[in-house]
């Protein structure tokens, strides 16, 4: 059964990869491919022109129309020139918050989804869950178009897409 410990391990696992937009994301992609392969989930890789970066998508459940895409990106913004009190690619928990490059934007969304794959597989899904992880979102969504085209060509059309990208993550103000 999935629990918060497993999810925290997945968050730490993904944050540990330096996937700054200026470097390759292939080590992270290979790690996720390996995990999904162990779970008997087929993965599809869409590389950039020079083969240094890749999108990854995978279908969990039946290959039928409908279902939902869980969409995220693997790259993070640079840490250079920032005053980090801790190692940016190591998750630190302090005051019930997690700190590390990519925790908010946006490796946590992908980590939680990936941590739930065993439950998804045992749920006897009637419609698929599709993971779609792109590269270079931080510098113009460069990877997403080729992956979207591949998914449209190779998989049944989903009913919905959930994009785990945080928007305006400022603390919420109470409604009075």
Regions found by a protein language model. Give the residues of each.
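Acidic/His- and Gly-rich active-site-bordering loop/insert found
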Residues: 1-103, 122-125
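Short alpha-helical scaffold segments that flank and stabilize functional sites
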Residues: 10, 61, 116, 146-147
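Fold-level recognition of mixed alpha/beta catalytic cores in primary-metabolism enzymes, strongest
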Residues: 95-98, 108-115, 121-176
């Amino acid at each position: 059964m999935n629990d918060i410990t497993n999810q925290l391990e997945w968050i730490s696992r993904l944050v540990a990869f330096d996937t700054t937009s200026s470097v390759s994301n292939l080590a992270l992609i290979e790690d996720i491919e390996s995990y999904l392969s162990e779970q008997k989930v087929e993965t599809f890789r869409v590389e950039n022109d020079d083969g240094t970066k890749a999108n990854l998508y995978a279908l969990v459940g039946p290959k039928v129309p409908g279902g939902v895409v869980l969409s995220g990106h693997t790259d993070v913004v640079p840490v250079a020139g920032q005053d980090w009190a801790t190692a940016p690619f190591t998750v630190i928990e302090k005051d019930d918050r997690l700190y590390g490059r990519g925790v908010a934007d946006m490796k946590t969304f992908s980590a939680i989804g990936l941590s739930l794959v065993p439950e998804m597989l045992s749920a006897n899904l009637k419609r698929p869950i599709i993971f779609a992880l792109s590269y270079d979102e931080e510098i113009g969504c460069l990877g997403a178009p080729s992956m979207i085209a591949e998914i449209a060509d190779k998989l049944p059309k989903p009913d919905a897409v959930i994009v785990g990208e945080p928007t305006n993550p400022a603390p919420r103000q109470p409604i009075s």
